[in-house]
Amino acid sequence: MTQANNAVYTDISAAQLVEEAIRRGEGELAANGSLVVRTGHRTGRSPVDRFIVEEPSTKDAIAWGNINRPFPADKFDALWARVEAFNNAQDHFISHVHVGSAEAYYLPVKMTTATAWQNLFGRCLFIEPEQYNPAGKDEWQVLNVANFECVPERDGTNSDGCVILNFAQKKVLIAGMRYAGEMKKAMFSVQNFLLPERDVLPMHCAANIGEAGDVTLFFGLSGTGKTTLSADESRYLIGDDEHGWGEGVVFNVEGGCYAKCIDLSEKNEPVIWKAIKFGAVLENVVLDEERVPNYADDSLTQNSRAAYPLEHVEKRSEKNLGGEPNAVIFLTCDLTGVLPPVSILNNEQAAYHFLSGYTALVGSTEMGSGGGIKSTFSTCFGAPFFPRPAGVYAELLIKRIKAFGSKVYLVNTGWTGGGYGVGKRFNIPTTRGVIAAIQSGALIGAETEHLDIINLDVPKAVPGVETNLLNPRNTWADKAAYDEAAKGLAKQFIENFKKFEVSDAIKAAGPQL
């Protein structure tokens, strides 16, 4: 708890960080006690500004391309020195946190930020350990200086902002970025590169535990329901977004949640609603005159967010981890209305759909996607965060599923009765009913019906869910239109899957024409 003379605030309390943020005009307090900030022209992640330093340890291990862009080591050193010197000349904030809750797999991180609110954000999302780095591991450094402006011609960046990962030096440089989600996802990408070397599968998923100790994983892209569906009052939350699956354990990479706020309601999302209080950060949420958040207002962005520590969730796993998963759920938001509310997958189908990562970008977290909705394929349900070739993660998933005997399901949180604009979206209570049936074990060994074209098996009955919803063809008034839509979706799957070199058994597990 030191405050140096040159205004370097080190490991000060969350309350003090809120105080400093208010004092510096970085944000304002909402009626619910949370700190409300605006992130400027970037209200989501900026994938075109993210780089990985190319050096001997990464050169042959990373799937280089549009997602993982190489950055020269000498340019990195020059830019780090420039940003560090700039930051040292102004007040800044330092916190010492962990990334990874399991003792064997945590990374100690020295997090330096130019703003108090981004330091508070990091304290919400990363893990505040009782003792910092007890194992004496090599320390990672995150340097996040939002008010530094990069000069592309000089710095080698793509714009005025950048996110650069350097594995050789254990450094993450974030400059010119006010959207704090960049910091969280940068450290996730670091763990996603490192964990497979330890035979641990890193996952873009939520996880919770039942009273009996049974664990459920929810894979899915932003807006498909990971945070909402894992925040279940009848179960204990492990985490809402980033986990590792090793032998005997599923552990949270983080110590907090980053929930989408658009149209948030106490009725539909009571756990999240209650968690947004003093110590939490609201990004790009509009307040009324009484300082009450208006979660329906998307005038700043569809991607408004709440960051809060897991301590704000009443029912949570105290250790921030659990055993291996009984149920693995792939959440997909299907815009075509073709996919059923729930399908039961075998191991080959699990590999196929994990590699495909079919879903929609709903109120996307990425810059430039706007409020529009479009279909996408995102490998491993999180392509932007997985630096290694996709096969590395798929092989680990199948290895883990086989070893533990986890059951795998594909759950559609998107449209039924027609595509987007014609049909309607499954409501949250219906999807919660599907999840409850999965978690109760009611679908294990259930009688199924096979759906041709999309090549999926659906249960004939799901407790608590209307039977006529289970086969999506039945929900369409025009059956021929459904068949055409199914063929169209199958074509998309087949086209996307051409890039993967996998066994014939896995190829045959997807949609067929």
Curated annotation (Swiss-Prot):
PANTHER family reported in the protein's UniProt record: PHOSPHOENOLPYRUVATE CARBOXYKINASE (ATP), PHOSPHOENOLPYRUVATE CARBOXYKINASE ATP
Gene3D superfamilies (alphabetical): 3.90.228.20, Phosphoenolpyruvate Carboxykinase, domain 1, Phosphoenolpyruvate Carboxykinase, domain 2
Cofactor(s), names only, from the UniProt record: Mn(2+)
UniProt KW keywords: ATP-binding, Cytoplasm, Decarboxylase, Gluconeogenesis, Lyase, Manganese, Metal-binding, Nucleotide-binding
Entry GO CC: cytosol
Pfam families in alphabetical order: PEPCK_ATP (PF01293)
Binding site for substrate: R45, Y179, K185, R305
Compartments it resides in: Cytoplasm
Catalytic activity: oxaloacetate + ATP = phosphoenolpyruvate + ADP + CO2
HAMAP family the UniProt entry points to: PEPCK_ATP (MF_00453)
GO MF: ATP binding; metal ion binding; phosphoenolpyruvate carboxykinase (ATP) activity
PROSITE patterns in alphabetical order: PEPCK_ATP
Keyword Manganese: yes
Pathway(s) per entry: Carbohydrate biosynthesis; gluconeogenesis
Keyword Nucleotide-binding: yes
Matches recorded under NCBIfam families: pckA, PRK09344.1-2, PRK09344.1-3, PRK09344.1-5
UniProt GO BP: gluconeogenesis
Residues annotated as binding ATP: K185, H204, G220, L221, S222, G223, T224, G225, K226, T227, T228, E269, R305, T431
Residues that bind Mn(2+): K185, H204, D241
Protein's name in the database: Phosphoenolpyruvate carboxykinase (ATP)
EC number: 4.1.1.49
Lineage: Bacteria, Pseudomonadati, Pseudomonadota, Gammaproteobacteria, Pseudomonadales
Record gene name: pckA
Function: Involved in the gluconeogenesis. Catalyzes the conversion of oxaloacetate (OAA) to phosphoenolpyruvate (PEP) through direct phosphoryl transfer between the nucleoside triphosphate and OAA.
Family under the similarity heading: Belongs to the phosphoenolpyruvate carboxykinase (ATP) family.
Cofactor detail note: Binds 1 Mn(2+) ion per subunit.
Subunit organization: Monomer.
